[in-house]
Each structure stands twice: as structure tokens, then as C-alpha cells.
Amino acid sequence: MFSWMKRGRSKETLKDRLELVLAYDRAQIPPGKVDALRNDLLEVVRRYFPTGNSSVEIEQRGDMVVLMANIPIDDTPPVRKSS
């Protein structure tokens, strides 16, 4: 019905993905390294806090490549594993 709206979002999504690929390339980050870092970061944070949906991204900001982590903390206390 509103295909023109969908196309606009697809264009923006494609642009965002291209910017991300270029940032990875400029920072010389090997494939899979960001995913491994994301998993490690979330594992450490989840030891101390319950978390919701999170995102870890790399962005190009001028001459710098920036790692952005958005990790919302849930209200419920974390489940501690007994040793």
C-alpha cells in the first residue's frame, strides 16, 4: 500500500550498511572481530546487570572510527551462578 515509504527506509538501511562497511574497512577490522567483541562485551556486562536488547556498532565520525555500545539495563536483578 505505501511502497514509497518502504523504499525510503530501504534506501536509508542500505546507506547505513554501506557506512558501516566503510568504517570497518578504514579501521582495518577483520571480519568477525566486531561480532566477537560484541559477544565478549555483553558477556561481561551480563555478569553484573540483566540486559535487554543491545547493539554494538562501529561508526565513522570525521577522522575517527568510534565503537558505540547501547546496552539497556533491565530492572530485574541478575541471576548469579553458584560456583
Curated annotation (Swiss-Prot):
Domain of life of the native organism: Bacteria
Q: Which GO terms describe its biological process?
A: cell division; regulation of division septum assembly
The disulfide bonds in this chain are none
- Protein name, as recorded: Cell division topological specificity factor
Spell out the InterPro entries in the cross-references: MinE, MinE_sf
Q: Which family does it belong to?
A: Belongs to the MinE family.
The record's SUPFAM superfamilies line, in alphabetical order, gives:
Cell division protein MinE topological specificity domain
| Claim: Lyase is one of the keywords in the record | no
Q: Source gene?
A: minE
The record's function comment reads: Prevents the cell division inhibition by proteins MinC and MinD at internal division sites while permitting inhibition at polar sites. This ensures cell division at the proper site by restricting the formation of a division septum at the midpoint of the long axis of the cell.
